[in-house]
Amino acid sequence: MSSLEKQLEFLDETPQDQVKTAVLLVGHGSRARNANDALLRVVDHFQKAWPHRILRAAFLEISPPSIPEGIDLCVGEGAERIIVIPYFLFRGNHVKVDLPVFIKEGRKKYPDIDVILGPHLGFHPKIIEIVDERIHQVLDTLKTEENALP
């Protein structure tokens, strides 16, 4: 079970009179068709796992909904706390500079809502497993192609 799943499982177990918490997964955004599908699939997974919880996607730029729109959606669904999780591997300027600005703006717009910036994806042993899997996929393809040559 992932760290986010554990956090959401905890949220799932809290009494209904507790603070209503939303999770907003934030990706970069792209003009390329289907470029945002991975993030949307992750959000869809968690929406199905916890259908009574608020789980939404938003994008830093280009793609809708924007981060302010995502915060608005969460508040519109009754969120009293919003945990913003950056769907970014690296702690570059978007994570260090841009996202905190959006968090500050969200807090200013909704002073009674607790808007929290969570950690970006960063390094995790499962990332190593995924990279290893991708390397082996390519190597297996090369072996298949080499064996297919006359």
Please name every model-derived segment:
Residues 1-150:
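Active-site-proximal alpha-helix that buttresses catalytic centers in soluble enzyme cores
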